[in-house]
């Protein structure tokens, strides 16, 4: 069986899925806290930028993959309105349940679905927009997931990937210190789970950099792929169209 990486560890492909599931079952109840710790609260600004770039309009069909606690889903559902169709999806049952409950608590009624991004259960050319925020790096076969995202996107639609990326060189030393020393300590102190936070830091380092991901999206068949660096490359928003 083929090998892949789980953080810095080399594991069998089927083992990665189990390990990633374990991480997100563990952090689900504290996921918003995790995002705050990992990003020093900046994830809200990055998501707001993504929402603005998405420009969802009334009647849009939107697929939010690895949607977690539903920050993007909530904004898209409000923008698409009653004539739209916005799906809140995640491969992890714990994350899906937490996200669904939080959406309902905020008065957002939209369908939630347990969904593997490598095998999306929707027909070709269905969605105006497909998004994944902070989820692609945890997927075993990123190329397959990107191809699936393109498949279910309508001609004229877009795929958007918001993900941690490669920081600019002047920031690297401080960023490494925060990621590998401070973040696990915070995870232990506030969530009693240093190991999950250590994996998340490692998974960021193993994720393709900005230009590599751009090439992967092009190889998946997406057109006019571009990206924006946010916060010195800590995060990048990639966007590709389907012509």
UniProtKB/Swiss-Prot annotation:
Identify the pathway: Quinol/quinone metabolism; menaquinone biosynthesis; menaquinol from 1,4-dihydroxy-2-naphthoate: step 2/2; Cofactor biosynthesis; ubiquinone biosynthesis
Q: Which PROSITE patterns match?
A: SAM_MT_UBIE, UBIE_1, UBIE_2
* GO MF entries: 2-methoxy-6-polyprenyl-1,4-benzoquinol methyltransferase activity; demethylmenaquinone methyltransferase activity
Q: Which InterPro entries match?
A: SAM-dependent_MTases_sf (IPR029063), UbiE/COQ5_MeTrFase (IPR004033), UbiE/COQ5_MeTrFase_CS (IPR023576)
Q: Gene3D superfamilies per the record?
A: Vaccinia Virus protein VP39
The processes (GO biological process) annotated in the record are:
aerobic respiration; menaquinone biosynthetic process; methylation
Kindly name one Pfam family recorded for this protein: Ubie_methyltran
Write the record's keywords in alphabetical order, separated by commas. Menaquinone biosynthesis, Methyltransferase, S-adenosyl-L-methionine, Transferase, Ubiquinone biosynthesis
The chemistry this enzyme catalyses reads: a 2-demethylmenaquinol + S-adenosyl-L-methionine = a menaquinol + S-adenosyl-L-homocysteine + H(+); a 2-methoxy-6-(all-trans-polyprenyl)benzene-1,4-diol + S-adenosyl-L-methionine = a 5-methoxy-2-methyl-3-(all-trans-polyprenyl)benzene-1,4-diol + S-adenosyl-L-homocysteine + H(+)
Protein family per UniProt: Belongs to the class I-like SAM-binding methyltransferase superfamily. MenG/UbiE family.
The function of this protein is: Methyltransferase required for the conversion of demethylmenaquinol (DMKH2) to menaquinol (MKH2) and the conversion of 2-polyprenyl-6-methoxy-1,4-benzoquinol (DDMQH2) to 2-polyprenyl-3-methyl-6-methoxy-1,4-benzoquinol (DMQH2).
What's the protein name? Ubiquinone/menaquinone biosynthesis C-methyltransferase UbiE
Q: What gene name does this entry carry?
A: ubiE
